Amino acid sequence: MSSETGPVVVDPTLRRRIEPHEFDAFFDQGELRKETCLLYEIRWGGRHNIWRHTGQNTSRHVEINFIEKFTSERYFYPSTRCSIVWFLSWSPCGECSKAITEFLSGHPNVTLFIYAARLYHHTDQRNRQGLRDLISRGVTIRIMTEQEYCYCWRNFVNYPPSNEVYWPRYPNLWMRLYALELYCIHLGLPPCLKIKRRHQYPLTFFRLNLQSCHYQRIPPHILWATGFI
């Protein structure tokens, strides 16, 4: 891939890439837009080639759209191994988590990795339990870091010429705060992250509300990394 011309013309994924402004709008951790964008890649069996595509919400959540598309477009034996990586602008809701769990139960040799930019309604217990169920099912769930943002930019975005390297314009602190909340979800702790959006200003405010259970069960270095301790 040439950094002088953007994605090369012969790139077979070019028509499936999204535009830079779409990537910024969907994956900005300070923007709480309702729509969800999914960037995904699939690797079949021991093959080295990776199949990439993108998707967005329609009348249904993008996770449901992916599952139906994946299961209807081709048949593969249950013994076939497949690795799927999702880069989501929002983590799955509780209902989508159930659908994902059912999908994985029917395809035991599928491995799923989820990288999310933000946590969807993270104070809703149904969503929190859904993420825990996915983790228990063996799904790896992480908050996107600079590394994932740069990877998505190079592989899913029709970036401008001479602009192959991407640096998120979002504060690294937001990533750490979402990661801390995901850690709380994994441990079954109550929410510690408060997010408010003031409609009269284009700003999103993050605040920690730590309880004694958080201090008791979360390692100090993880709390210190937020910069709030």
Curated annotation (Swiss-Prot):
Residues the entry annotates as binding Zn(2+): 61, 93, 96
Membership in a protein family: Belongs to the cytidine and deoxycytidylate deaminase family.
CMP/dCMP-type deaminase domain boundaries: 10-134
CDD domains, A to Z: cytidine_deaminase
Co-factor binding comment: Binds 1 Zn(2+) ion per subunit.
Functional description taken from the UniProt entry: Cytidine deaminase catalyzing the cytidine to uridine postranscriptional editing of a variety of mRNAs. Form complexes with cofactors that confer differential editing activity and selectivity. Responsible for the postranscriptional editing of a CAA codon for Gln to a UAA codon for stop in the apolipoprotein B mRNA. Also involved in CGA (Arg) to UGA (Stop) editing in the NF1 mRNA. May also play a role in the epigenetic regulation of gene expression by participating in DNA demethylation.
InterPro entries to which the protein is assigned, alphabetical: APOBEC/CMP_deaminase_Zn-bd, APOBEC1, APOBEC_Cyt_Deaminase, CMP_dCMP_dom, Cytidine_deaminase-like
GO terms under biological process: cytidine to uridine editing; mRNA processing; positive regulation of gene expression via chromosomal CpG island demethylation
Alphabetized GO MF terms: cytidine deaminase activity; RNA binding; zinc ion binding
Name by which UniProt lists this protein: C->U-editing enzyme APOBEC-1
Locations listed in the record: Cytoplasm; Nucleus
Organism lineage string: Eukaryota, Metazoa, Chordata, Craniata, Vertebrata
Subunit structure, as described in the record: Homodimer. Interacts with A1CF; form an mRNA editing complex. Interacts with RBM47; form an mRNA editing complex. Found in a complex with CELF2/CUGBP2 and A1CF. Interacts with HNRPAB. Interacts with SYNCRIP.
Domain of life, per lineage: Eukaryota
Active site (record annotation): 63 (proton donor)
Reactions the enzyme catalyzes: a cytidine in mRNA + H2O + H(+) = a uridine in mRNA + NH4(+); cytidine(6666) in apoB mRNA + H2O + H(+) = uridine(6666) in apoB mRNA + NH4(+)
Keyword set, alphabetical order: Cytoplasm, Hydrolase, Metal-binding, mRNA processing, Nucleus, Zinc
GO cellular component, one term: cytoplasm
SUPFAM superfamilies with a match to the protein in the record: Cytidine deaminase-like
A matching Pfam family: APOBEC4_like
